[in-house]
Amino acid sequence: MNNNDVEDIKKLKYFRLLAKQYPNIALAATEIINLEAILNLPKGTEHFLSDIHGEYEPFVHVLRNGSGVVKRKIEDLFCKSLLESDIKSLATLIYYPEQKLDIVLKEERNIDDWYKITLNRLIEICRFCSSKYTRSKVRKALPADFAYIIEELLHEQFNGIDKEEYYDRIITTIIDIGRAKEFIIALSKLIQRMIIDRLHIIGDIYDRGPRPDIIIDTLMEYHSVDIQWGNHDMLWMGAAAGVRTCVANVLRISTRYANLDLVEEIYGINLLPLATFALKYYRDDPCESFIPKVKEDDPAANQEVDLVSKMHKAITILQFKLEKEIIDRRPEFELEERLLLDKIDYEKGTIILNGTEYKLNDNNFPTIDPKDPYKLTEEESVLIDKLVYSFVNSDKLQKHVRFLFSKGNMYLKFNSNLLFHGCIPLDDDGNLKSMWIQGEEYESKRLLEKFDSLSREGYFEKVGSEEKTYGMDIMWYLWTGPVSPLFGKKKMATFERYFIDDEIAHIEQKTGYYKLRDREEMCDMILREFGLDPSESRIINGHVPVKKKNGESPIKANGKMIVIDGGFSKAYQKQTGIAGYTLIYNSYGLQLVSHEHFSSTEESIMKEKDILSTTLVVEQKLKRKTVEDTDIGKELQVQIKDLKELLLIYRKGIIKEIR
């Protein structure tokens, strides 16, 4: 038997399986017709968001309002028949149906009339938003309680009085039986869902913001989402895997921004051992360099500043000690220069870095032995073990991190776009930077794929195995390493920022990627590395805030790269001048939406105050893109090809039809 015979047998087995799904010519032909019809529909709308940094309120609002698209749809339909105030009220109802209905029920005198008018408007909006999708796709999105009725109303054609009466009777019955409120909620959520076909989160769900957990809970309920991991995401993923350096870093950042409610209340991590340790060793230390960044209007956080400052310093020193064991174990990480505790002159209170002597602003190190500065005290060893245990055994954190692994990756190719959070490692001349991992050299696409697989091993492999240990070390490297695609800098100057006042020592030099990202030829080279055609592809990423207020454009390299970190995080909004970007990719092309500051969910509901958004057309297609032009379209074309071959097999009698 030769290779051709083997291939023919495999092929026949495949078609016998396909024949079970389509057992005769009629069914196979019908499916071909259906798939061909789908190919000609407009492509679904994709939304891209990045660098949310735990700011759940603006994130949830942007999802609910479709980055301003919901209101534009209302205006398209009702601009000639509704006042602006009515449009705002209708939009708010769609964004927050439960809360808005509670207000309406208290204020509206003739609620049945209001229900009838509102239901008719919502059905019209829903019909408009769902018109580019197949009935099958819309049907799958319908809430089970109202699936049949909504489908009837969406696809009703008013060709006569009887049809209109039928439609009106359905609406009246919904109101009469007391289900109007639930029906409005169902329609509002369906509209939200129809606006966004696919959501891309390009990294950093976590960081300093208060509630990344709400963001992940929201994404877990979302109909279609993918995530490209950010450096802060990887740090939390490493902590959940039990990486001691990641645990210390997470707690350092959490104490720095007084964001301990997330750690203690939401994830149930016991911080009492850290507080007890910090009070013992830093009771009389003002810890001035470690005073957390708290809001003036947060009295609870301000009351705890002294304790949190001490916890902040304690975990920071512990972090510096813990990093040595990985750096020593993995010389290929090339991070020896970040070992600084042994470079301190503890008597003089100085340190020499790159030939320059700096005076330390703090020389109180009660847990450091100058003769062996990286050695953990017995209490430190017990402390880090307790903290790691809490992270590894937090059910909610583990559930969230498993979701990040299931929906996430280091990069994604999707509909000719290349998505990644940070960068592709390059040197200053634009050459690809490589890294030796387990005796083999990796760069570019292979490097990102290797980091992806090693991270999964760090989380999922058996405790104590070499695979898990190496993967755990890589997870920390991805947070801080010079060839990490999630970091993008030559060093992380954490020690210098805490202990040296001279800001020259704080400089973290970016890698070549950020110096050269305005060059079209560099973007073309990266796209080719990932198997994409530069003439029709682009890079979409975040990580570095775009300083729009200084005139910086998010559109780089003649449109080959779009950077969408616009400052969801309040801490960066002074730099960016805006409060975030959404990139929208629909059948007409690309639109970049910049968002103004979001006050609060409460104000959005009570005052019907929406986020002000400005839309910039990045790319306008003369010919509307269809499903055929997408990745799903390519898959459907393969299915059509196979089904056509199955028809031929039936007609030749190779496989018998079942009628």
UniProtKB/Swiss-Prot annotation:
Cofactor: Mn(2+)
Gene Ontology MF term list: fructose 1,6-bisphosphate 1-phosphatase activity
Biological processes annotated in GO: gluconeogenesis
Keyword Manganese in annotation: yes
EC number: 3.1.3.11
Cited InterPro entries: FBPtase_class3, Metallo-depent_PP-like
Gene3D superfamilies named among the record's database cross-references: 3.60.21.10
Pfam families named among the record's database cross-references: FBPase_2 (PF06874)
Biological pathway: Carbohydrate biosynthesis; gluconeogenesis
SUPFAM superfamilies xref list: Metallo-dependent phosphatases
Membrane-crossing residue ranges in chain numbering: none
Keyword annotations: Carbohydrate metabolism, Hydrolase, Manganese
Reactions that this protein is recorded to catalyse: beta-D-fructose 1,6-bisphosphate + H2O = beta-D-fructose 6-phosphate + phosphate
Coiled coil (UniProt feature): none
Protein family (similarity comment): Belongs to the FBPase class 3 family.
Protein name, entry field: Fructose-1,6-bisphosphatase class 3
